[in-house]
């Protein structure tokens, strides 16, 4: 089943990331962490569905997305940056394997942060704390960190910011990759479950490393496109 959404507003979150707010159809219910396939209702783009994750659940009258734009790719995300209020998109029913299985370690790369936004917001609203949870968020540069202030203000959440393309980032940001050396310090059973989202190769590598450190596959939550 598909749903038609009307854009209410578009605002900048970072230099290349946009917050899109749509009117929510009453029959579209989305659990935190689930994705939808989104299609632009523009000529030449109606056969270009792409997966995006709402950053809010089924509460309220809107469906919100935070989407990183890649203008150099000349694809759907480049078009996202030019959407205007009143334009329509079409989305599928929600799908996906990423869900809230309780406090744990959230590992995100770039735009892979979006399912965790919804999960962490919902749990904080429900329980009042994110105690026992750690967010490890890797980006190319410090300017790419999405919603940093919001995450740092979340009660009980430990945040670890990593950048890969800057050698001298600002305070509380590490110039480091998520490799075996880094992950060894976090891959402990008491830090499970491990939630992973990001580029496919990154997710595969991290899952493989976690398993090699003795983490059970059942304690790893990731999207499965197989």
Could you tell me what each predicted segment is?
Residues 61, 72-226:
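FNR/FR-type flavoprotein reductase catalytic core
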Residues 2-85, 139-141, 164-166:
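Ferredoxin-reductase
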